[in-house]
Design a protein with these regions (language model features):
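Absolute protein N-terminus
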Residues: 1, 23-25
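Bacterial N-terminal signal peptides that target proteins for export
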Residues: 1-9
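Repetitive helical segments and hydrophobic/amphipathic motifs
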Residues: 12-13
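C-terminal motif of bacterial Sec signal peptides marking the signal peptidase cleavage site
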Residues: 17-21
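Active-site- and interface-proximal helix/loop "cap" or "latch" segments in soluble metabolic
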Residues: 26-148
Length: 148
């Protein structure tokens, strides 16, 4: 009788394991965007776009846009003033955060960059929303409530 119980329990455990393995979700291939719902006090709104192929992030973009549609990374005056103040500007930190996401595949594993920690927090929040949409296969832009 003990052998029957052990055999039954073994089959239940194996079946459950197979169902869990088959049911696991991964990121769906495609492009996924996220952005904050409002502009910050300086007139910028963060945005992230990721591209997923074969279940992995193959490309990422991070930037801020103003109401006119201009990108922070293209604003030479902002780049110069931020670089003077903190040692790094949006041209560098935007690319570095995006590259780190492609390498690590997980927003929570992306390290903060000295001089751009607030932007790093924004990036992680937005990248996490984009990854959630990729996991769910939602192609509409994820709109994230901005921190005040």
């Amino acid at each position: 009788m003990n052998k029957k119980v052990i055999a039954l329990l073994s089959s239940v455990v194996l079946t459950a394991g197979m169902l869990v393995g088959c049911g696991s979700k991964g990121m769906k291939d495609g492009s996924y965007k996220s952005e904050f719902d409002t502009f910050d006090d300086h007139g910028w709104k963060g945005q992230v776009e990721i591209t997923v192929a074969d279940g992995k992030i193959t490309d990422a973009k991070f930037d801020y846009v103003n109401e006119a549609g201009d990108l922070k990374s293209k604003d030479a005056k902002y780049q110069e003033s931020m670089t003077k103040a903190s040692g790094i500007g949006p041209v560098e930190f935007s690319a570095q955060y995006a590259k780190a996401l492609v390498e690590k595949q997980d927003p929570t594993k992306v390290d903060a960059i000295t001089g751009a920690t607030t932007s790093g927090d924004d990036f992680k929040t937005l990248a996490d929303a984009a990854v959630q949409h990729a996991n769910d296969g939602k192609t509409e832009t994820a709109v994230v409530k901005a921190k005040k």
